[in-house]
Amino acid sequence: EMGIDAVTLANNHALDYGVDALLDTCEVLDGAGILHTGAGKDLNAAKQPVVFEKNGQKVALIGATRVIPEAGWAATNGHPGMLSSYEVSVEPLLQQIASCHADGEKVVVLIHWGIERDEKPQEYQRALAKRYIDAGADLVIGSHPHVLQGIEYYKGKPIFYSLGNFVFGSSIPKTMLVQAEFQGENLSLRLLPGISSGGYTRMLTDSGEMTQFYQ
């Protein structure tokens, strides 16, 4: 009903209730026709992208996390979990990005990272984002800090370090959506500011509200 076609499951709460709950989540999403990336029954499943195609253009979404409470939450060849993006375990993600890029797909990396309530990205976030783009990513979108963080371009590719909370019971109201449209080698972006409060998100349309939002 909300029009959600795909989600990333790579985050620091994905295994709060254990492996069975994670796999149950995957099954529920499958039953609802919602595609998912970033976690699964093993590493191969966790790193699989969600691929959309429209007008001959393929776009791959790859989810991963750099915030894992316990090492055992990371997916391995024989163990369920999430796709990890720590420096010691980032290679499967980089290889998946490169593979999708080689297949002619535009690659969007959905990465869970950063420090909660910190409006500035950590240096490791900036370093990882550049590695993703060097591997073939076209757009990087971050989550986890619960606040808006900065936007950076690297080699002409945009990095959104954090978009805040889309739907979340938080005292931090500012949030944002990014509308991205790939047309061949061109990427057009539109920023949609909003206010999230009490589990409800309202996108801003009034020019006065938007001016105040950006101040």
Feature names for model-found ranges:
Residues E1-Q215:
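Acidic, metal/ion-coordinating pockets
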